[in-house]
Amino acid sequence: MVSMRIPAGVAAAAVAFLLFGAVPAAAACFESGVGCTNSGYMPYPALRRLSCDALWTVRNTIYSENGYCFKTARGLATFDNSSCSYDDLGMVPLNAYERENVGRIVKVERQKGCR
């Protein structure tokens, strides 16, 4: 068996590529039954099937879509800060679906022991 290490940025991009479905101007939609970030509640069973990396990508896509300015190396490698507006996560304006979806993702990340 051959083993390869894939850089985190490449892995995150691959996860995003595999998960993204059609992407409207203001929201990402994910395949695998997860749904769109801002127009419906993401089902727990679909979220539980995702890896920790995929959960991180989906959660942070919601923040990116709404103008969060990423500061970590992983965030900067994955998302474009060119049109960001908010340095504080608490100030990022989320609609009710987005707020609930972030909460659901965080809950599943905790259940799975994601970091």
Regions found by a protein language model. Name each.
Residues 16-25:
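C-terminal segment of classical bacterial N-terminal signal peptides
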